[in-house]
Structure formats: C-alpha cells, structure tokens
Amino acid sequence: MRCRLRLEGRSYAHRLYAERALLTPAAHPDRSAWEKPGFLLWHATLRWQRMVGVALKPIGLTHVQFVLLASAWFLEDRTGPPSQRELAEHAGTDAMMTSQVLRSLETDGLVERHPDPADARIKRLTVTAEGRAAAARALDAVDALDKVFFGPAGDRDDLVGLLRTLAGRDADGVPLD
C-alpha cells in the first residue's frame, strides 16, 4: 500500500517531486544494506537469539528467562539477594517485564521473592537449588553455542573487548558513559 500524500491544491510539479522523494533512496543508494554494520549486527543478533532459543528449549527456559535467572544467580553470589530493580538494571530489561518473567520463574520453583527486611516494598530474589541447576545447564548450553557462533570472529578476548566497547561497559559491567 502506497503512502498517500496530502497535497490537495498543490501544483502538479510539487506533487510529482514529493512522490519521487518518497520513492528515491535518500542516502547511499550505491550501498547494499548487507554492507551496513548496524543492519548486519541486527541480523547477527537475531540469528544468535534464535540459536540460543533452540539450545535452551530442552532445559525449559526461554532466552529472557535464562538471562534473568543467570543474572539473579550471579548477583546473589556476588552481592547477596538482588532486588527486582537491581536485576532489571543488570540484565538491561524493562522492570515490568522483569517482574512478569520472575513470576513465571517463581511458579516453576526456580526463584523465590521475599520482602526486603528494611523496606517491604522491595522484593529480594533468591535462586533455588533447582534454579541453580537449571541455570548451570543453561550456561553450559549457551557457552557451547557461543564457541560455535562466535568462533569465526577470531580471538575471543578481542571479540569480548570489542563487544564491551560497543555495549558501553567496562569489564565489571559499569557504564562507560
């Protein structure tokens, strides 16, 4: 379906010019989308996410469940039970979506949510023994996939450094900006 222009009362030349502007690529008409880094990164990310989904299916986790479960386990071991907000910030996920996914993980017996002793409005998360086992299996599966997927990129440490730079984070995940 073509976009209709609201050009009533305009001259024929103006209407023709406006229509051609819609049909003419504005920038880099000689470059393929497959030469643009952002477009390639988008497609590489989509491919990687599909492959992660396949790797996690036998474990019974979705990709976002895996990220939140593994992140909760990491944060809990490092600094104690995280709050839902801390988990969302660490994982880079929306707070509302994080809460919904945590509800699912809680129903499955993989995490528990408890009120913070100092502030009952804050929910603290603990990963259950079953959750730790599922996270460990999932981490093994994703690590194996990453070796295959990212192998063609060359040196792992160089790739991780580049990805950290692109993500705007240091080695501890602290924003560089």
Question: Where are the regions a protein language model picked out?
Answer:
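Short, hydrophobic-biased segments on the C-terminal half of alpha helices
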Residues: 84, 102-103
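Hydrophobic alpha-helical core bundles mediating ligand binding, dimerization, or RNAP-core interactions
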Residues: 37-56, 135-170
